[in-house]
């Protein structure tokens, strides 16, 4: 399997091909290549020692919020992929789910118009609403910090 868009098997159908090959007892190997989420993680300025890659979230808000809620209390830096058509909705749902955490949006990494925006989710959402998103996006969101708690969490336990 050869790809022109990063490491095969990361958020693409390559995963299915690899699993089927393994099930059929076919030897599988790979030559490591670039993976956009690793580059976005490093460039985000957020902690890199422990992270969770979540890939593409569900397309609709209700499913996306449930998907994000699974990691609401996670201390790990969270990484998502998103399309330009759903970026604004994603950021609205992320702000609602995670609160106004530090985050970064990476776009068109390794290309001529590569960009990384950093700031609170609210500021990133405001910036996205002022421009027309293009290309694929990687969103990196800080995990829950020390002293933070989930809404309704009992701090006396």
Language-model segments: what does each one mean?
Residues 16-74:
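Class I SAM-dependent methyltransferase SAM-binding "motif I" and its flanking Rossmann-like core
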Residues 3, 30-33, 80, 105:
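General beta-strand structural signal in soluble alpha/beta enzymes
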